[in-house]
Every structure is written in structure tokens, then in C-alpha cells.
């Protein structure tokens, strides 16, 4: 019988947001995991018949938290600080079929750091297979810390809430979304710059209360910014490499800027997206799409 892993292991409140279904250790720092992607999802909606590539990033994120708790002894209540997260999806293998996609994941952990017996952080790389074919690759690096250290680090930021009222969203179609509630960008008077919309009531992007803007929200802002450059040309984010340099606070404006890079000879396009808050960079993302996605 197949079921999802306990939601607590992947830091999700809603069972519907859990994509991992099992795991086992295959070597000292190597693991085999299984996952399932639904044919339809309330937020990670298919793009031109292809699974949303950000579903790969969310699956990769869940891998790190699960292994930390289940295999590396990280206590519930410890906090995770994500430094980078990346994916590369093969759209020719990622088409939505007649049944949910059952995935097998090969995970290799490295740069494992400990403070005494406590895990302090690590890096891991993931290869995702579907039907024996590689559907995506990716990885991430993070630190983890005790609640006491996190409290000292965040201070009075713990418990902060977002900017109200929410700024007006862009038109959903201009950023590749169907619903206004799923739009995370708001227009500004400056070209290729938007204000981040932080809707803490969103049931997927804010699955549970947090005291900062989640990394997946920042990655979604990069995807939407890349699409907003030219809404008439679909932008399937087959590659994303995000780096998080500091917390993006909920209660201060965050500005998202996009810089289109020259297209490759084969039509592949890349956009560099950065997020700034109080004149400081909080994240950067290099996001790409294949020429065939146009």
C-alpha cells in the first residue's frame, strides 16, 4: 500500500502538499526515495501538457527536510536556512500522462557538517526518474539550527506579519497563472521591476505560518517575472538556480527585478532575477527555458 510520508517530515501542514511517498538508505550518505506527482494540482498546474518544473524544486526541497529528520537526527522544531536550490527538468520526459507520475529519486548527500552530534548543514544532489528515464535533476544546500539560536538570530522578527493591504496583482495571464490569488507580482513605475505580493493566506505558498518569505515564493516570483517580460511567449522554467543570501521579511516591500540575457543560437532563453529589500539583495535566480517552449 502506498501513502505519503508523514507531513511533519517535509514541513507541510496539508497532506495534499506532500509529494514524497517513501525512502531507504542505500549507502552511508546515499538514499533512494519515491514520490508521486498528481496530474492536477491547485497551484503547480501543468504548463502546455508538461508538469510544472517548480514541482521538481518543491520535491527536492522536501527531500532535504525528510532526510534531515528521518536519517540525520534533526529534531522537530529546529529551523532550516536554505542557501541555494536548483532544478533542471527534461520537458520531453515530463509530460502529464494518463496516471499520476510515480518517481524514483537517487539522492547523494555531501558536505555534511555537524556541531557535536547535531547536524549543522549539508548539500545534496537529486536525480529524479520516471519510468526508468531521467525526468529532472537538482539539489540544494542548507544549514539547520536550534530554536534558541534561531530566536537569537531573528529576534523580534519572529511572529512578524506581512504588508497590508496587498498591492494590486498583475493580470494572471501576463505571468502564466489562471487565478489572481496566485499572482505574486505587482506593477511599479519602473520597467522590469515589480513589488512582491506576500499573501500569507495563500493555502500552498503559505501552507503554515512562517516569519519570513519562503524560498519557494521567491522562486515563484522569478518564474512570474521571466514570463512577464513577454507574456505572449510561454516561458517554461526548465532550469532554475536560486541563491538565498538573507531572509526576505514579511513586513517590508521586496522589489523583484529581471534582466533578460541574450538568447542562445538554439533559441534557449535565460533571465537573471534578483530580489531586493532595504537596498540589499535577498535572493538571485538564473532561470531558463528551452527554445522549443516558445
Swiss-Prot record:
Protein keywords: Transferase
The organism's place on the tree of life at top rank: Bacteria
Keyword Transferase: yes
Phenotype on disruption: Null mutant is unable to produce virginiamycin. Addition of VB restores the deficiency of virginiamycin production.
InterPro entries listed in its UniProt record: AfsA-like, AfsA_hotdog_dom
Gene Ontology molecular function: transferase activity
EC annotation from Swiss-Prot or TrEMBL: 2.3.1.277
Class of enzymatic activity (EC top level): transferase
Presence of keyword Transferase: yes
Short name of one Pfam family: AfsA
Catalytic reaction equation(s): a medium-chain 3-oxoacyl-[ACP] + dihydroxyacetone phosphate = a (4-alkanoyl-5-oxo-2,5-dihydrofuran-3-yl)methyl phosphate + holo-[ACP] + H2O
Known role: Involved in the biosynthesis of virginiae butanolide (VB), a gamma-butyrolactone autoregulator that triggers the production of the streptogramin antibiotic virginiamycin.
NCBIfam families: ScbA_BarX_GamBu
Protein family per UniProt: Belongs to the AfsA family.
Protein name: 2-oxo-3-(phosphooxy)propyl 3-oxoalkanoate synthase
Organism: Streptomyces virginiae
Amino acid at each position: 500500500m502506498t501513502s505519503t510520508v508523514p507531513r511533519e517530515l517535509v514541513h507541510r501542514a496539508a497532506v495534499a502538499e506532500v509529494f514524497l511517498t517513501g525512502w531507504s538508505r542505500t549507502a552511508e550518505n546515499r538514499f533512494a526515495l519515491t514520490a508521486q506527482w498528481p496530474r492536477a494540482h491547485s497551484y503547480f498546474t501543468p504548463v502546455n501538457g508538461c508538469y510544472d518544473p517548480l514541482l521538481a524544486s518543491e520535491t527536492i526541497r522536501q527531500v532535504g527536510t525528510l532526510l534531515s529528520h528521518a536519517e540525520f537526527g534533526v529534531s522537530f522544531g529546529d529551523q532550516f536556512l536554505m542557501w541555494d536550490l536548483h532544478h533542471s527538468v527534461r520537458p520531453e520526459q515530463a509530460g502529464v500522462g494518463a496516471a499520476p507520475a510515480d518517481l524514483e529519486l537517487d539522492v547523494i548527500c555531501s558536505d555534511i557538517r555537524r556541531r557535536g552530534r547535531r547536524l549543522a548543514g549539508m548539500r545534496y544532489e537529486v536525480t529524479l526518474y520516471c519510468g526508468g528515464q531521467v525526468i529532472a535533476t537538482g539539489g540544494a544546500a542548507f544549514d539547520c539550527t536550534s530554536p534558541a539560536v534561531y530566536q537569537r538570530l531573528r529576534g523580534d522578527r519572529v511572529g512578524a506579519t506581512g504588508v497590508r493591504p496587498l498591492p494590486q496583482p498583475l493580470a494572471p495571464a501576463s505571468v502564466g497563472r489562471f487565478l489572481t490569488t496566485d499572482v505574486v507580482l505587482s506593477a511599479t513605475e519602473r520597467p522590469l521591476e515589480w513589488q512582491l505580493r506576500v499573501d500569507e493566506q495563500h493555502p500552498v505558498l503559505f501552507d503554515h505560518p512562517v516569519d519570513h518569505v519562503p524560498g519557494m515564493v521567491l522562486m515563484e516570483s522569478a518564474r512570474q517575472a521571466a514570463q512577464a517580460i513577454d507574456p505572449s511567449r510561454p516561458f517554461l522554467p526548465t532550469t532554475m538556480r536560486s541563491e538565498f543570501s538573507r531572509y526576505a521579511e514579511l513586513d517590508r516591500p521586496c522589489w523583484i527585478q529581471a534582466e533578460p540575457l541574450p538568447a542562445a543560437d538554439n533559441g534557449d532563453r535565460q533571465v537573471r532575477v534578483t530580489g531586493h529589500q532595504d537596498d540589499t539583495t535577498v535572493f538571485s535566480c538564473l532561470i531558463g527555458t528551452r527554445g522549443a517552449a516558445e
